[in-house]
Amino acid sequence: MLEYISSLPKQPISEEEKEGLIEMREEEKLARDVYLTLYNKWKLQIFKNIAESEQTHMDAVKYLLEKYNIPDPVKNDSIGVFSNPKFEELYKKLVEKGDKSEVDALKVGATIEDLDIADLEKWINKTDNEDIKFVYENLMKGSRNHMRAFVRMLNNYGSNYTPQYISKEEYEEIISSSTERGMNR
């Protein structure tokens, strides 16, 4: 993916596009950090696998930050450490909830992907840069796949998930559709 992104032109970037990249870098880190923490607690393979995917999402956004000479908000890559206090608070809240049971942990995973999808949709609508849109669209495919995986696991536990950030209709469409592949260009 990085090879393709590097082939796209560097376009003028707005303050809003910069803000989106900074926010998504830390939001992808939030996902990775929560999943690693929950993996250490529950040893459910899904958390380890998706944390690895979140690392590639972080790397793709970092590549764009470097491409556009935007300072990386991830100054300290330690788990649970964020530049933006909102992500530090969210990390603590989500880990506390996920610490209660395996089902709660899986619901936390679905919640993170729910938030990710909503935020990516917001930022996609605020950018016209081809490379940024491409990365966001691929991150969104990943988030939809992750949501499907968490919901499948919840169903295996006899539980389910109610969306908090995206519409019920969008959620139903996501979980009833097939796994998506990245890099469609």
From Swiss-Prot:
InterPro entries the record matches: DUF2202 (IPR019243), Ferritin-like (IPR012347), Ferritin-like_SF (IPR009078)
Lineage top rank: taxon: Archaea
Pfam hit, one: DUF2202
Membrane-crossing segments per the record: none
Name of the protein: Uncharacterized protein MJ0754
Organism: Methanocaldococcus jannaschii (strain ATCC 43067 / DSM 2661 / JAL-1 / JCM 10045 / NBRC 100440) (Methanococcus jannaschii)
